[in-house]
Regions:
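Amphipathic, oligomerization/interface secondary-structure segments
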Residues: 75-78, 82-132
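Charged alpha-helical initiation segments
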Residues: 1-73
Length: 132
């Protein structure tokens, strides 16, 4: 998407035009408040280091601004993966510094240590909350 003109910065992305909320059996267009409500309750479980909290909140903020530019969802997803990777590094190494390998390796190590649940043998990847 090209840069929006100043006068339309706060208009929803056109892809939100067809998203509706049902309230008391009446359909209405989704608003920024609705979009915010869908994001605000998504949070981290348990205590997380400040660095992880900041990285995760950055992802949520980007997702919020995607209401105005839908393409920001991709940026928000990448930031969320970065927050997940940072959380695994803290859990496995005790700090967010350099850890060997890829996110895949961190997930495998976390499963071996019990930090993440093991994948059920024979299950479909999409049924696994980490792999999906």
């Amino acid at each position: 998407m090209s840069l929006k003109p100043f006068d339309s910065l706060l208009e929803p992305d056109p892809r939100f035009a067809d998203l509706y909320v049902i309230e008391q059996d009446v359909a209405r267009r989704m608003t920024l408040r609705d979009h915010h409500a869908g994001i605000v309750d998504v949070g981290l479980k348990g205590a997380a280091p400040v660095e992880v909290q900041k990285a995760f909140d950055r992802a949520r903020s980007i997702m919020l601004y995607a209401f105005f530019d839908y393409d920001l969802f991709v940026v928000g997803e990448i930031q969320a993966f970065g927050a997940f990777e940072l959380a695994l590094k803290f859990r496995l190494s005790g700090h967010g510094g350099d850890a060997r390998g890829t996110l895949r390796n961190l997930v495998d190590r976390a499963r071996k240590t019990g930090a993440l649940p093991p994948m059920v043998e024979g299950s479909m990847l999409m049924a696994d909350p980490v792999e999906a």
